[in-house]
Amino acid sequence: MSETTTVPPIETVSEPNPFIVFATVATIISAFIGYYFLQQSKKHTPVLKPDEFQKFPLIEKIRVSHNSAIYRFGLPKSTDRLGLPIGQHISIGATIDGKEVVRSYTPISTDDQLGHFDLLIKTYENGNISRHVAGKNVGEHIEIRGPKGFFTYTPNMVKSFGMIAGGTGIAPMYQIITAILKNPEDKTKIHLVYANVTESDILLKEELDNFAARHPDRLKIHYVLNEAPANWQGSVGFVTPEIIDTHLPKASNDTNLLLCGPPPMVSAMKKAAVELGFQKAKPVSKLGDQVFVF
């Protein structure tokens, strides 16, 4: 009798489905990316609280004129951001002579600045908060809450901005200008008329002129002085309808006019704007108004 040989079964190994492998890898990568950006967003935590004053330390004071300075305040962590939309402002509060005093200021820094924020403040003889801040030494704190305001800038929201600023009224304009010019996808044109008493009163002039030199097709600046030196290239006196008509864009549906400065100046500019075809400014400006007063 012959012997029969049993052949053991051969195990077959199936090839992995490439589509399943790809889907698995893609899922893992997507999960990792999502986790990464979640952690990054947590790192850059906005710290402002609209209904609660918080203390922030003064970390640097940069003198920019005889009565104005940039005050840099630290955030809790170097990866924190203030949490202030472009065009809005904060409130500084203090107890002065037994009374609670609150004033609004717009930082000149933008919200992508991490670890600190900058305020440009002019010290007035009768300005309670401005003197309060000016009297602070590095390491001392001020109390701030926010954000506040009805204007929030988004890229390309209009074709062009006409801006009229007086003195420290340059602060919200500077913040908006910075946000526009640092974004290569933002095609907004900016025309700024900036008024001051003397040439030494022009705040952030070097920074503004550098912006204009680097972006001549996007930013135009015209300076106006009450007291001008010899060979002054700008206008002399007050901002007039003629100056506005010459140096700012014409009224149109895709042009907004932004105003910020001393109350008498702003009042005169609102009247001039109407003469030039802009809509009458409302008592309280809101986003979407053709003429917005900060």
Curated annotation (Swiss-Prot):
The keyword Membrane applies. Pathway: Protein modification; peptidyl-diphthamide biosynthesis. InterPro entries: CBR-like, Cbr1-like_FAD-bd_dom, FAD-bd_FR_type, Flavoprot_Pyr_Nucl_cyt_Rdtase, FNR_nucleotide-bd, OxRdtase_FAD/NAD-bd, Riboflavin_synthase-like_b-brl. The chain crosses the membrane at residues 18-38. Its EC number is 1.6.2.2. The keyword Secreted does not apply. Belongs to the flavoprotein pyridine nucleotide cytochrome reductase family. NADH-dependent reductase for DPH3 and cytochrome b5. Required for the first step of diphthamide biosynthesis, a post-translational modification of histidine which occurs in elongation factor 2. DPH1 and DPH2 transfer a 3-amino-3-carboxypropyl (ACP) group from S-adenosyl-L-methionine (SAM) to a histidine residue, the reaction is assisted by a reduction system comprising DPH3 and a NADH-dependent reductase, predominantly CBR1. By reducing DPH3, also involved in the formation of the tRNA wobble base modification mcm5s 2U (5-methoxycarbonylmethyl-2-thiouridine), mediated by the elongator complex. Monomer. Component of the 2-(3-amino-3-carboxypropyl)histidine synthase complex composed of DPH1, DPH2, DPH3 and a NADH-dependent reductase, predominantly CBR1. This is NADH-cytochrome b5 reductase 1. It comes from Candida albicans (strain SC5314 / ATCC MYA-2876) (Yeast). The gene is CBR1.
